[in-house]
Regions:
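Compositionally biased, intrinsically disordered low-complexity regions
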Residues: 107-110, 116, 129, 133, ...
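Nucleotide and nucleotide-moiety/phosphate-recognizing core
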Residues: 46-160, 164-205, 380, 384-390, ...
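Short secondary-structure boundary/hinge segments and terminal tails
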Residues: 103, 126-127, 140, 213, ...
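Structural alpha-helical scaffold elements that stabilize or flank donor/cofactor-binding regions
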Residues: 146-147, 221, 463
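Internal gly/pro-rich beta-alpha loop/helix module
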Residues: 153, 158-265
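Short gly/ser/thr-rich secondary-structure transition/capping motifs
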Residues: 121, 128-139, 209-213, 274-279, ...
Length: 587
């Protein structure tokens, strides 16, 4: 029983993220009992720093370490950690980025022989210079940047979870010089976030400074970490894109928070979660009772999408797929999948739009696919003169690619939209314009694909608010949003970025939805589909690299550090690996 409880807690810790207010509430009972959380955090950070340097075959007494220390508790964590490292012989310089430093942490650091460089002329730090000129302030900033760049390790303890929005002032200047400014890291997708081996290494204390702690956004300059040691529980930035890519390898130190009855702000999908979406076959099952998927996908222009969507749906534990489309696509589907049934009939879910041209494409309506989809989507319309009173009783429907511009103004939650960043920007612009017109409000600033990529959670939530649909926003870490939940799935290797992969996801999603008895589980089912899609890609590519790598618990045995990168794949490989992925999660 002890092992089970421990395993359950580990599962909860490593797949749940809590916003800053929740984390503070979780800390409070422990602080009231006198639990020294700051000292515990500092010990974990110092241990991690020493380990990072040891991995590079560097002894502490031969290293130069720079601490970027803010004025708050995060800076205190860093100062106590830096003091411990200095006591072990490291050459440590603390760069004070604010007007004060945590009093006890600062005293401990000075006693250990650490050096302090103050950057703010208005700082009031005992024994340190202040009141210097603007010219000297600029020189000190350049000195700080130079010292940091020449160090072996930077410990980033500037802001922690307390800041909202982008960095300002001195922290922003340091982040701009030492890190990136409002763009996601562009690095090879190595397994387990392996370090490039370049110095300085960066250890983020709790969260990288400058990222959106609660929404995973990139609002401005930030410092990408080699390793993030996070305290107590994961924060949303550790699991949400693009901030998760700035965290590097994530190490979690368990404070013992009481999280059993706390709903996470973001839940990360894993095998156990995804297994609930797979309906196990019954002895009395027929092809109809196991779930039937109807697909209006592919076109004269893109017939291959019909093959990929039907192939994926058929291999994802359904009893039958029905295909509607032009003759060329029908023939290709039957050649690839003779089990497919051509024509209309009763279904438990629909998949529409994959491989169907948008309205802006020449001859988009030439094969009648768009007309068929528009007529079907009319049954899901809410909140207008075209409202269908039975919309909530309609089967779930996956609206992909070329069908997104046919989405009605308001739909129930069993309508699932699956855009990538570019498609999401177009959809948001269309619906924001309609909302502004209806409310006689000023027009909004147009969204771009980059806007969506830099703040995908806000984009997905806004799309849900505007449409009512369950939203799956594709990415290296895919986000699924409905009224009450945010799910993240990062099971896919980077090899999945290949033509037709979204078609496979659409078919797989429709298949899982067809297996459900209750549309209330739509978001969970869709998130499970994203996870299985990534897992199938990992199987097909023989890769252990993932968009999101599960953290390691400090004090537990670490997993294999170097993993398999794998090899390129095509979308059809992913579809054929779906049965093995399903077997993996249900076993």
């Amino acid at each position: 029983m002890e092992y089970t409880e421990d395993a359950d807690r580990r599962e909860l810790l490593l797949h749940s993220a809590y916003d800053s207010d929740t984390v503070r509430a979780l800390e409070r009972p422990l602080l009231d009992k006198g639990v020294p959380l700051m000292r515990m955090a500092a010990q974990a950070a110092a241990h991690m720093a020493a380990g990072m340097l040891d991995d590079e075959d560097l002894a502490l007494e031969d290293t130069s370490i720079v601490l970027l220390a803010g004025a708050g508790d995060n800076g205190g964590d860093g100062l106590f950690a830096a003091a411990a490292l200095a006591q072990e012989g490291a050459n440590v310089t603390a760069i004070a980025v604010g007007r004060s430093l945590h009093e006890a942490g600062f005293a401990s650091f000075v006693r250990a022989g650490g050096k302090v460089l103050v950057l703010d002329p208005a700082a009031d730090i005992p024994g340190c210079a202040s009141g210097f000129s603007a010219g000297e302030a600029g020189e000190r900033l350049q000195t700080a940047i130079a010292v940091a760049r020449k160090s072996h390790l930077i410990i980033d303890a500037m802001t922690g979870i307390g800041i909202q929005g982008s960095l300002r002032g001195i922290p922003a200047a340091l982040a701009s010089a030492l890190g990136l400014d409002g763009e996601a890291p562009d690095e090879p997708a190595l397994p387990n976030r392996e370090s490039s081996g370049d110095f300085p290494l960066v250890l983020a204390a709790d969260t990288p400074s400058g990222v959106g702690v609660n929404d995973g956004s990139m609002p401005g300059p930030y410092i990408p970490a080699t390793v993030t040691v996070t305290f107590g529980a994961m924060k949303p930035c550790a699991v949400l894109p693009p901030a998760t890519f700035a965290c590097g390898r994530i190490e979690l130190f368990d404070f013992g928070f009481d999280i059993d009855d706390k709903d996470p702000d973001v839940e990360v999908v894993d095998n156990s979660f995804a297994s609930d979406a797979v309906r196990l076959p019954r002895f009395e099952d027929s092809k109809y009772s196991r779930g039937v998927v109807g697909l209006v996908t592919g076109s004269q222009r893109y017939p291959g999408a019909a093959v990929l969507t039907t192939s994926a749906a058929a291999r994802a534990n359904t009893g039958m797929v029905r295909y509607l489309g032009p003759e060329r696509a029908q023939n290709m589907v039957l050649t690839a999948l003779p089990e497919a049934v051509i024509g209309k009939g009763h279904v438990q879910s629909w998949v529409v739009g994959s491989g169907v041209p948008e309205a802006s494409v020449e001859d988009a309506d030439g094969d009648m696919q768009r007309d068929t989809i528009a007529a079907l989507l009319k049954h899901y319309t809410l909140g207008s003169e075209d409202e269908n009173k039975d919309a909530y009783d309609m089967p779930p429907i996956v609206v992909d690619a070329g069908a997104l511009d046919l989405l009605p103004e308001r739909v129930p939650g069993q309508v699932v939209i699956t855009p990538h960043a570019g498609e999401m920007a177009k959809l948001l612009n269309r619906f924001e314009t309609a909302a502004s017109t209806a409310e006689h409000a000023d027009s909004h600033e147009p969204y771009t694909a980059d806007d969506v990529r830099l703040n995908p959670l806000a984009s997905a939530k806004r799309a849900h608010e505007l449409t009512g649909a369950t939203v799956l926003l594709k990415g290296a870490v895919t986000i699924v949003v409905d009224e009450d939940h945010v799910y993240a799935s990062g099971s896919a290797p980077a090899w999945l970025g290949t033509a037709g992969a979204g078609d496979v996801l659409a078919g797989l999603t429709g298949a899982l939805l067809a297996q459900q008895d209750d549309v209330a589980t739509t978001a969970e089912t869709v998130a499970s589909a994203a996870y299985l899609h990534g897992l199938a890609a990992a199987i097909a590519s023989e890769s252990e690299q993932q968009g999101w790598q599960e953290p390691e618990l400090i004090g537990r045995e670490h997993r294999q550090r170097f993993m398999t990168l794998g090899h390129p794949i095509v979308a059809g490989d992913v579809a054929h690996a779906i049965p093995e992925a399903i077997a993996d999660v249900i076993s």
